[in-house]
């Protein structure tokens, strides 16, 4: 088995999908989880205005709507959380995403004050954060807020991780990567677009250039620039297609060096890091 085949198998990626079937699969997955653990009353998700959180948010709300109707349990809710750092440049996209999702509840937590306070506390201890590390601080502060909300609403935190993100480890460890349940896991980027199109999402929300937008020195830096490959390249690779050798090497290097991000904390029983 080639490394490409191993990666595809590990991430559960498929060369083709039926959008309606995958929508149903994700909704049923979320519903089954909630029914298995009846003490869970809410799904909590940060909404950025990008493709992934828009899709995950819509699926969460659809799952909650169906489950309330089927069970009569009106205590179930989906909570969409806005988590700007100061003023967000694409705030209108966030509002458009919320209008599309129609969440039961929308909360806004501006993380700038908390990030600056943490940065100052570290500075006083003699640690000056780089712009890159400050970006990770933002991602972790966003996740901390979501877990606080989940803790106070008997909820779980929903993630947006999918195959095209997991393969490169393009997320912050214990930041946006630290979630309870990931309904998009298995899909690549173009497949996520297919689901949103089938759901009637406004096109500009999934045709915009994806960006983590964490670094102050490089605001709105496109993911594809940071990664050195395009999402079309990544999607082709995940679909088992032949890609240029340099593209394959770049993707595989990302996968191998970020393996620790896709695993629990390393113990004496792990040996993947020795290979």
Swiss-Prot record:
Superkingdom field: Bacteria
Gene Ontology molecular function: any one: ATP binding
Residues noted as binding deamido-NAD(+) in the record, renumbered to the chain: 140, 173, 180, 260-261
Pathway(s) where this gene product acts: Cofactor biosynthesis; NAD(+) biosynthesis; NAD(+) from deamido-NAD(+) (ammonia route): step 1/1
EC number: 6.3.1.5
Positions contributing to Mg(2+) binding: 52, 165
Binding site for ATP: 46-53, 160, 189, 211
The keyword NAD belongs to this UniProt entry's keyword annotation: yes
Assembly, per entry: Homodimer.
Record NCBIfam families: nadE, PRK00768.1
Family the entry assigns: Belongs to the NAD synthetase family.
Protein name: NH(3)-dependent NAD(+) synthetase
Organism expressing this protein natively: Escherichia coli O139:H28 (strain E24377A / ETEC)
